[in-house]
Swiss-Prot record:
Organism: Aplysia parvula (Dwarf sea hare)
Signal peptide: 1-19
Tissues in which the protein is found: Bag cell neurons.
Protein name: ELH type 2
Keywords: Amidation, Cleavage on pair of basic residues, Hormone, Neuropeptide, Secreted, Signal
InterPro entries per record: ELH
Gene from which this protein is expressed: ELH2
Lineage: Eukaryota, Metazoa, Spiralia, Lophotrochozoa, Mollusca
GO molecular function (one): hormone activity
Length: 252
């Protein structure tokens, strides 16, 4: 009996929950759980749809309000945005001085291979030549110059658009070559200066040795002559003998 009573109570609760309907202005459609099986009504008690189909969120009163002020504000905002886009599309023509190209709807839609639609949803025409990315083009004379900078890795047309751009930390081959040549030139200059200095030192040493040899020879000649004179004249004084002894000692 107790189990039968419990089954009846559960069946009554399930029936009441399935037939329950939410009313009132205090109910917020945004707060409803998407998996809820209840029917969601608008504040005006108009049927919107099942929340399981996400229609209550798409057609909530906050987005579809029947108030005239909100509708006028939304319309003004849409028109302002539309005028801004039209002015943005007309700006490149006024700056560049190009005449507006008039294209019919049929001719614009006839290009099936086009990657972009020529007309947007607001009616502004998409102009491919004005919206294309700006590329730097150079004359054929500069391209065919044959210089090292015009190689494939140094092509000025593709250098700015390449993924691997050369930075200041990775210099080019030409700059490395120039720096290496300048370094070699500095080394050679330093070697030349060192050789010149060594040569001057050797020359000075040779001149000094030659001067000392000449001085020694003159002193020897003078000593010999003085010794011969001393032997010839034996009556010289003691001072001259001491002088001769000192000279002989110096020569030795």
């Amino acid at each position: 009996a107790i189990s039968l009573l419990m089954c009846l109570i559960l069946s009554a609760l399930c029936a009441s929950s399935e037939s329950a309907v939410v009313h009132g202005d205090d109910f917020a459609a945004e707060r409803a759980v998407k998996s809820s099986p209840y029917l969601v009504l608008s504040p005006a008690d108009e049927m919107v749809g099942m929340s399981t189909a996400n229609e209550a969120f798409d057609k909530s009163p906050s987005y579809y309000d029947d108030d005239d002020d909100d509708f006028v504000n939304n319309e003004k905002r849409r028109l302002r945005f539309h005028k801004r886009r039209i002015r943005f599309h007309k700006r490149p023509q006024e700056v560049s001085g190009l005449k507006p190209v008039m294209m019919s709807r049929a001719s614009a839609s006839a290009d099936e291979n086009s990657l972009f639609d020529l007309y947007n949803t607001d009616g502004a025409m998409y102009q491919r030549e004005l919206r294309a990315p700006r590329l730097r083009f150079y004359s054929l004379r500069k391209r065919a110059a044959g210089d090292e900078d015009k190689a494939e890795e140094h092509n000025p047309e593709t250098e700015s658009h390449s993924r691997r751009k050369r930075s200041a930390l990775t210099p080019s081959i030409r700059s490395l070559r120039s720096s290496l040549e300048s370094g070699i030139a500095k080394i050679s200059i330093n070697q030349d200066l060192k050789a010149i200095a060594d040569m001057l030192i050797v020359e000075q040493k040779q001149e000094r040795e030659k001067y000392l040899a000449d001085l020694r020879q003159r002193l020897l000649n003078k000593g010999k002559r003085s010794s011969e004179v001393a032997l010839a004249a034996s009556d010289k004084g003691d001072e001259e003998r001491e002088l001769l002894n000192t000279l002989s000692n110096l020569l030795e």
